[in-house]
């Protein structure tokens, strides 16, 4: 089984991992109730999408 010839330094390891960071989720406010939702998704609070009720939400 192959093994690394030299130890990977901390800086080389961190440079390799520099692109692995997660980005924050983008959120927008619902046009009907003002709750924060993902773009292009039905609002979980009121069931509206593009100013139309598409899902009945029980109170």
UniProtKB/Swiss-Prot annotation:
Superkingdom, taxonomy of origin: Bacteria
Annotated Pfam families: Ribosomal_L32p (PF01783)
Keyword entries, A-Z: Ribonucleoprotein, Ribosomal protein
GO MF assignments: structural constituent of ribosome
InterPro entries registered for this protein in UniProt: Ribosomal_bL32, Ribosomal_bL32_bact, Ribosomal_zn-bd
Cellular component GO terms held in the UniProt record: large ribosomal subunit
GO biological process entries: translation
Similarity comment: family membership: Belongs to the bacterial ribosomal protein bL32 family.
Protein name: Large ribosomal subunit protein bL32
